[in-house]
């Protein structure tokens, strides 16, 4: 029987958890929403899974037991503080990880093919105890009881959560979004993509994982589009490598606030090398739209100020649908790198993912063939 969101958070409360930090997954959309108004357990939206684990460890050091909620596709981000902080310092933290792409790789998206099957083996190799929470298995209270002696011994305990083990309840999005004086009719992601495509000619376009890539694919698929599936937070770095390798071409990055927050240090690298042929478009709707509309921390983050301080030559803030196309035109005429922060709203058509029609390897190969004129094939 699936665990309801309220039962999930109640179980955490009953087991003494006093703080939860995490990165959203649709498997946990309901519990994260429930935590938003739970009086005794603050929820800390983390930039990435590693910072979530570190935050939980810090809470435990201060005497407040803590838990982490994460998607298995972000397990790689979590490995570093797991192996260099939590394990060597023997800090007991409870970690919930969704098992996308498990038990069959075909049950998830392409980026879950590898991580979906290796998390239990990796935990075994690190001698980290883990339990499964299944729709037809022992309930959450029983599973958490099994973690008590593990945590009491100073070790982390992992609960791997299968699809359907927690009820798929509608997540509640961000509260009223923060706006600035002069903000107008905010675009949704489809409005943004439509405006960008109206101005793009020979440019190469990288789009971040999630609904932005779906919107780009459904509105204007072409070989010069690279659709990220997974690798959240790395699209700007991917584009930077191409921009430095091919200075005669122009590159556009379609990014999101959650993605930029995940690895925001990449902005300083882009600013340091300052490729003049890079236009970085950041769609800031202040939610993780692809996982159910959970709030990011972007409402208190001034991306334009950060980009200026990181060395971007040009930074512009746009907050109306009508202003997007002129801003793209200005960016194409100017020397980059440009960061165009587009204050947007949640919503837009979900659409089909690109890999439903074009395989992930083919996305890379056709893009590279266009970029290198077929002279340096990937394989």
Give, region by region, the residue ranges found by the protein language model.
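A short alpha/beta connector and helix-capping loop motif
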Residues: 83, 91-93, 263-284
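A contiguous pocket-lining binding segment that forms or flanks enzyme active sites
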Residues: 277-317
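A short, acidic, amphipathic alpha-helical segment used as a generic capping/interface helix at domain edges
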Residues: 320-333
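Thiamine diphosphate
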Residues: 1-240, 244-249, 321, 348, ...
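Short acidic/polar active-site loop segments enriched in Thr and Asp
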Residues: 18, 65, 276, 313, ...
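Active-site regions of oxyanion-processing enzymes, predominantly non-cytosolic
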Residues: 155-160, 336-342
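Residue-level marker for buried hydrophobic side chains located in beta-strands
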Residues: 205, 251-254, 281
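DG-centered beta-turn motif at the end of beta-strands
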Residues: 73, 249-267
């Amino acid at each position: 029987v699936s665990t309801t969101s309220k039962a999930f958070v109640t179980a955490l409360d009953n087991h003494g958890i006093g703080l939860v930090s995490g990165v959203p997954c649709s498997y946990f959309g309901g519990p994260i929403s429930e935590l938003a108004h739970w009086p005794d357990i603050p929820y800390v939206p983390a930039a990435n899974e590693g910072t979530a684990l570190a935050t939980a460890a810090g809470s435990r050091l201060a005497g407040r037991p803590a838990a982490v909620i994460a998607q298995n596709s972000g397990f790689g981000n979590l490995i570093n503080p797991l192996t260099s902080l939590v394990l060597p310092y023997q800090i007991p933290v409870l970690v919930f990880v969704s098992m996308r792409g498990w038990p069959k790789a075909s049950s998830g998206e392409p980026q879950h093919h590898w991580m979906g099957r290796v998390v239990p083996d990796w935990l075994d190799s690190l001698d980290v105890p883990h339990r499964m929470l299944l729709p037809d298995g022992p309930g959450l209270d029983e599973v958490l009881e099994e973690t008590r002696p593990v945590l009491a011994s100073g070790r982390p305990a992992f609960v791997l959560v299968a699809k359907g083990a927690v009820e798929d309840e509608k997540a509640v999005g961000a509260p009223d979004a923060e706006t600035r004086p002069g903000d107008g009719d905010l675009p949704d992601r489809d409005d943004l993509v439509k405006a960008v495509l109206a101005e793009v000619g020979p440019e190469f376009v990288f789009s971040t994982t999630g609904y932005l890539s779906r919107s780009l694919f459904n509105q204007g698929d072409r070989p010069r589009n690279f659709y990220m599936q997974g690798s959240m937070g790395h699209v700007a770095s991917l584009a930077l490598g191409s921009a430095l390798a091919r200075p005669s071409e122009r590159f556009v990055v379609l990014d999101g606030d959650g993605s930029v927050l995940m690895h925001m240090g990449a902005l300083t690298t882009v600013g340091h090398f300052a490729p003049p042929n890079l236009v970085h478009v950041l769609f800031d709707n202040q939610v993780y739209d692809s996982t159910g509309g959970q709030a990011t921390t972007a409402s208190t983050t001034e991306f334009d100020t950060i980009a200026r301080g990181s060395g971007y030559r040009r930074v512009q803030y746009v907050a109306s649908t009508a202003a997007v196309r002129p801003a793209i035109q200005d960016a194409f005429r100017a020397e980059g790198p440009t960061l165009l922060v587009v204050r947007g709203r949640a919503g837009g058509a979900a659409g089909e993912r690109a890999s439903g029609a074009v395989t992930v390897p083919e996305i890379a190969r056709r893009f590279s063939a266009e970029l290198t004129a077929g002279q340096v094939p990937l394989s």
